[in-house]
């Protein structure tokens, strides 16, 4: 669908692409991946070990998509893309290579108590079959509670990129009505911030979709970076949050997803939550 869209036809892109491509294996290509439990590494399926090549594969995957998103966005239009913190740099490089200007990085902070996913060395020491029990206890005491380097996750990164403007901020707005923010939009009653605190939604409500985002957060972003009546695009629609939020914000929207089940969920949500 992206290939068929007109140049300079979209005002805003808000999207949450899949992070763990090789963890989704061939099922992702068939449109059946993504409904698995989460493991110790946020955003990646259980049993999948993160390695540096993961980011390179994500960047390779996003490069042609970002090229199309750059093409279809109006000059001055923004692209807001969610990412796992350890992958956001690859996502950013891909957007920059496509021609975008990187404006900022935001944090979606969630207050719900997340699982502390660090592993204690005690367990691994106890599994050492060639060690005497006394030696194990001595080593456990020596390690003094050391764990693997995973802190309790409390945020997701949001990359903010912008297609270069035509002329000045004012001239670009007068021609395309893009490139500026509506600073009246606020989550807290204060000026909009780079840290946005919104509670996580219930995954079970959306057929167990792993990375569903809060409608309130997406609606805030849409209102901040676009105007009523404009077109918002999400090329990784998932359970439909972007389209629901866009309709609530009185914007038009285009949602794309390879998973037919999620398309049906999105259609139902749009009908149930916006009428």
Give the label of every model feature segment:
Residues 1-275:
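Core catalytic lobe of class I
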